[in-house]
Amino acid sequence: MRLRALLLMVAALLSGAAFVTPAAAQIEVDINAGAVKPLPIAIPVFSGSTRGAEIAQVITGNLERSGLFQPLNVAGVPDKLADVNVQPRFPDWQSTGAQALINGQVTVGADGGLRVDFRLWDVFSQQQLLGLQFSSTPDNWRRVAHKISDAVYERLTGEKGYFDTRVAFVAESGPKLNRIKRLAIMDQDGANPQYLTDGSYIVMTPRFSSTSQELTYMALRPTGSSIYLLNLETSRQETVGKFPGMVFAPRFSPDGSKVAFSVERNGNSDIYVMDLRSRATTRITTDPAIDTSPSFSPDGTKIVFNSDRGGQAQIYVMNTDGSGVRRISYGGGRYTTPVWSPRGDFIAFTKQTGGEFHIGVMRADGGDERLLTTSYLDEGPTWAPNGRVLMFFREGPSGNPRLWTVDITGRILRPAAYSGSASDPAWSPLLD
């Protein structure tokens, strides 16, 4: 199945002959302060096609799950917004308490293709904030809804959206002591889940390439462990080299040309980097300690990892050739699974202290550490492409791990849309 985008944005910021788009919005959402009170927003059914109700529903779900918006029940509003090019009757929408309004229209072509026009309005200033038009094939209507969600999110928060993305994860089933762990993938809102492996062997730690077209992951079989590359467009799968000992925790470099991973031999774990073209492999740590969980910086010049070389697991940063190692975490407890933000400003991690687990973030230099969650077991953070939201998995004493999301303030914590047992999430970049 082709996962490359089939959508085409055919017009951006429509001129809107009858409407005026202001230079600055009257309403905005401060994402960095956290959502104390979500913004009331009206998202009525898009006109023109039965598909319009489904598109509006997906947009509603996306914005509501972000925690920054409060979609309102507007089924009884007299203004039905039949024509996207006609200005809304704002008193009708003001009476709902909405501060923002999204309306849209779906046009179905002779070939079944869709054209979706939408507008974003400031209800009280009665000004248009945004107008876009998208075209897609009939089966990609959800992609249109995600792109509209991203556009609205960016216009009202000033940050890039993250809705037109996918999540790879480990789908778990069976008894706690004999789990079946299959590689799976889904849209970020839980739609279109599919298995990528058959469950005959255990998979762990999937990670996307920067193009979202490839995954790397660890497979554990009775004969040992291996790291695989899986092309999501062709379904071609290959092993990344042969190594003595346990191989685990793979991650792509930002340009996709390399994979960093750990190899454990005789109780010692070190980090290696493989060039995927030449298959040349370089060992970049040689300390007689456990060095693991490598993650590249967005510019590809550094790697963050965790190591117990200081006595217990802490976070370190080094150059990609292994030089310049420096410790950046100094708090009590154990730090594991560090991962660099796509923006380069924060590093997320798992912390174990006082019998509890936390998902936390710190600045890239180790400063401004903050713990965002507390639970029996929270682990495996992965960044949304805007670098302002994290997904992780949470597990209770009885097992049954679930996916959760939290923003970088820690104030917006909620279960992810996927309700099945799942661990080791990996968030893709924005799709093309």
UniProtKB/Swiss-Prot annotation:
Question: What is the protein's major site of localization?
Answer: periplasm
Query: Would you tell me the protein name for this molecule?
Result: Tol-Pal system protein TolB
Q: Which domain of life is it from?
A: Bacteria
Organism encoding this protein: Caulobacter vibrioides (strain ATCC 19089 / CIP 103742 / CB 15)
Cellular component terms per the entry's GO annotation: periplasmic space
Alphabetical list of InterPro entries matching this protein: 6-blade_b-propeller_TolB-like, PD40, Tol-Pal_TolB, TolB_N
Which PANTHER family does this entry report, sorted A to Z? PROTEIN TOLB (PTHR36842:SF1), PROTEIN TOLB HOMOLOG (PTHR36842)
Q: Please give the biological process terms from Gene Ontology that the record holds.
A: cell division; protein import
Which segment of the chain is annotated as a signal peptide?
A: 1-25
Q: Which family does it belong to?
A: Belongs to the TolB family.
Gene name tied to this protein: tolB
**SUPFAM superfamilies associated with the record:** DPP6 N-terminal domain-like
Q: What does this protein do?
A: Part of the Tol-Pal system, which plays a role in outer membrane invagination during cell division and is important for maintaining outer membrane integrity.
Alphabetical keyword list: Cell cycle, Cell division, Periplasm, Signal
**Membrane-spanning segments:** none
Q: Where in the cell is it found?
A: Periplasm
Quaternary structure and partners: The Tol-Pal system is composed of five core proteins: the inner membrane proteins TolA, TolQ and TolR, the periplasmic protein TolB and the outer membrane protein Pal. They form a network linking the inner and outer membranes and the peptidoglycan layer.
